[in-house]
């Protein structure tokens, strides 16, 4: 790649997308790097059962918690990030 950018944003979710939108109003050359691709346009996208019940787009990887126990995080790698699946809603803890 021979192109040069002023800024690189990692991820296009809520944070990265907001930063990219704000910076798009400047003269900066911006590159967004996303781990996943676009979610396919298909009927299953509109089915809560397919998306949530069958976890159609959920990543298959496993993580380890602080005790070293394996768990399957509810995460997605796609353009728009997890925000696409959470409807841009973030709950306070």
Language-model segments: residues:
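N-terminal glycine-rich phosphate/pyrophosphate-binding loop and immediately adjacent elements
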Residues: 1-93
């Amino acid at each position: 790649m021979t192109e040069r950018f002023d800024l690189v944003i990692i991820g296009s979710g809520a944070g990265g997308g907001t930063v990219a939108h704000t910076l798009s109003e400047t003269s900066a050359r911006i590159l967004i790097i996303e781990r996943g691709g676009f979610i396919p346009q298909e009927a299953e996208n509109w089915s809560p059962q397919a998306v949530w019940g069958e976890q159609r787009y959920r990543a298959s990887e496993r993580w380890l918690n602080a005790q070293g126990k394996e768990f399957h995080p509810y995460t997605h790698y796609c353009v728009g990030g997890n925000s696409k699946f959470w409807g841009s809603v973030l709950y306070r803890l």
